[in-house]
Design a protein with these regions (language model features):
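Short, well-structured alpha-helical segments in soluble
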Residues: 77-89
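Conserved hydrophobic helix-helix packing surfaces used for dimerization/oligomerization
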Residues: 33-35, 161
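Rossmann-fold NAD(P)-binding glycine/threonine-rich loop
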Residues: 106-123, 127, 230-281
Length: 285
């Protein structure tokens, strides 16, 4: 049976360290790192995520602001709110909760957030820095995965690393971070042929496709490390990942559960990025 990688426990340890550094930053500078989260509409899942982000930031001693805007918000109104946050010196990190309602231009919104306040690391400038390995912020989920691997003393250098999923938010940056850690990286997607053959070559398998229990135990190399980024509801409404945990657990050497795996680490990286943004802002004064 696989070793269970407890993301919740790792997140608690990491957040305790962040809280200590936030306190030291406040003592030295007389200000708190500030995070603003903008949410448009009434998406229930988004509301839960925003509530969790607010609580987590306040728990480590940060200043937290949630800007709730109605579903009918226009592009101009949203951009005006972002402009206000952009010039607010109390706010060091700005996050727009995705997805946005369909009538809003997500790309324009993400481009408008200044790179130095882009704590989700979605701005093209920040993604470019990730490509060359010279970054100020890391995308929250991939960086959270890297922290987990480091905490578990899982060697990446020289290992076959397979990432299923090529999104800009998880798949692509995840592959780049594994590459920077000297892994031999393969990215798989919907057009990949003989997927199971590729996944069975992986020493480290990261799955981020948004399909409930898509990867089964017979697709996994015995002893592999399996990181499940997925967050889905099955036909019974139960929370589950992209990996069929029951069959995978019997084959893998280590595996992240859903819930309690990658999710807590994503928010932890957001806190880390917000503190870094505040430190950068102070150093520029």
């Amino acid at each position: 049976m696989a070793h269970i990688i407890d993301g919740k426990k790792i997140a608690e340890l990491t957040r305790a360290d962040i809280a200590a550094r936030v306190a030291a930053f406040h003592k030295d500078n007389g200000i708190l790192p500030g995070l603003a989260v903008v949410i448009v509409g009434e998406n229930p899942a988004s509301k839960v995520y925003v509530r969790n982000k607010k609580k987590a930031s306040e728990d480590v001693g940060m200043y937290s602001l949630v800007c709730e805007m109605p579903e009918s918000t226009t592009q101009e109104e949203l951009m005006a709110k972002l402009a206000e946050l952009k010039s607010d010196e109390k706010i060091h990190g700005i996050l727009v909760q995705l997805p946005l309602p369909k009538h809003l231009d997500e790309e324009e919104v993400l481009k408008f957030i200044p790179p130095e306040k882009d704590v989700d690391a979605f701005h093209a400038e920040n993604t470019g820095h990730i490509m060359i390995g010279d970054y100020q912020f890391l995308p929250c989920t991939p960086a959270g995965v890297m922290t987990m691997l480091e905490h578990e003393n899982i060697e990446i250098a020289g290992k076959n690393c397979v990432v299923i999923g090529r999104s800009n938010i998880v798949g692509k940056p995840m592959a780049m971070l594994l590459l920077h850690a000297n892994g031999t990286v393969t990215i798989c997607h919907s057009r990949t042929k003989n997927l199971a053959e590729v996944t069975k070559s992986a020493d480290i398998l990261v799955v981020a496709i948004g399909k409930a229990r898509f990867v089964t135990g017979d697709m996994i190399k015995p002893g592999a490390v399996v990181i499940d980024v997925g967050m889905n509801r099955d036909e019974n409404g139960k929370l589950c990942g992209d990996v069929d945990f029951e069959s995978a657990e019997k084959i893998a050497g280590a595996i992240t559960p859903v819930p309690g795996g990658v999710g807590p680490m994503t928010i932890t990286t957001l806190l880390e990025n917000t503190l870094r943004a505040a430190q950068m802002a102070v150093s520029k004064k």
